[in-house]
Amino acid sequence: MKPLAVTLGDPSGIGPEIVAKAWSRRKSDQIMPFFAIGSAASIQAVSSIPVVAITDPNEAISIFDQALPVWDIPSKETITPGKPNKAGAEVAFAALEKGVALVKQGQASALVTAPVSKAELYQVGFTFPGQTEFVANRCGIAADDAVMMLAGPDLRTVPLTIHIPYRDVLEQLTPKLIISRARVTVEDLKRNFAIPSPRLVVAGLNPHAGENGTIGREEIDSIEPAIRQLQAENIDIKGPFAADTLFSPRARATYDVALCPTHDQALIPIKTINFDNGVNTTLGLPIIRTSPDHGTAFPLAGKNKADEGAMVAALVMAANSAHNRQAYAQNSIDG
């Protein structure tokens, strides 16, 4: 398989540090070869690991055991850990463009993206709500057809609505949206995670899942019709269930992924249960994309205090997903 492509994110954040630390765990965690894309200087500013510049992803395979291969995108200004600037945002933007292009061209097996600062990116022409929507756009996929899934060793969740105010959730949470997100989720749990018959559950929006309409009708008017349609398509999906009881160990054993009406319903349990190794992966794309489920953490940058666990988990998930998708495609041909 081709190496993984890993963007460094904002070079003033913890991205360079966690990528360097992940490379240092390449043997103990059996991480497949990868190359970083971004400012090589930003890695050298926070780590003493050996770095080798490359101009061809194929070079990464032979270099990886001895040094971190880097597709260098130099900054126009000095990069200072913890102090983001426009030049750093330009590097992060360019790295993301390059990473998507290389994976689309088949020169890398999957894309792993370190955290960026959207506030900084907006200063240099970035117009998307986040990296998920950017990657979908560059892959020719409508934003509504790209599904964010958060995953850890103990739980997977999908937020049905993402970065919108709560007052807008009621309008966006339609049967059409739920059905679309569920279909994409089922397909990629099969392709990327080798789960032949995915089990889905849906959380209610209102307290106690609406109490049969006495605390809101979203469950009756939007969620239940979607579930009935999906069940008619032979998808294993149940709900709506009260969100406050859906994430206990006993409940989690009954499903493979929980679809959650709101952003925080999906992210709070992941960050509570799997804070140090949660991964954000985008479903519905022609490529594999994962990301550690945390931000740039500018106050930690340059202090050697950043935990690389989520980056390691994102690398492992990307490699496994690429392998599973390849096997799924081959089985489809053979079958």
Swiss-Prot record:
GO terms (molecular function) for this protein are: 4-hydroxythreonine-4-phosphate dehydrogenase activity; cobalt ion binding; magnesium ion binding; NAD binding; zinc ion binding
For the ligand (a divalent metal cation), the binding residues are 163, 208, 263
* Manner of cofactor binding, per the entry note: Binds 1 divalent metal cation per subunit. Can use ions such as Zn(2+), Mg(2+) or Co(2+).
Q: Which UniProt keywords apply?
A: Cobalt, Cytoplasm, Magnesium, Metal-binding, NAD, NADP, Oxidoreductase, Pyridoxine biosynthesis, Zinc
Q: Which cofactor does it need?
A: Zn(2+); Mg(2+); Co(2+)
Chain positions recorded as substrate binding sites = 132, 271, 280, 289
Pfam family of the protein (one):
PdxA
Q: Which family does it belong to?
A: Belongs to the PdxA family.
- Assembly, per entry: Homodimer.
Protein name as catalogued: 4-hydroxythreonine-4-phosphate dehydrogenase
| The organism of origin for this protein | Zymomonas mobilis subsp. mobilis (strain ATCC 31821 / ZM4 / CP4)
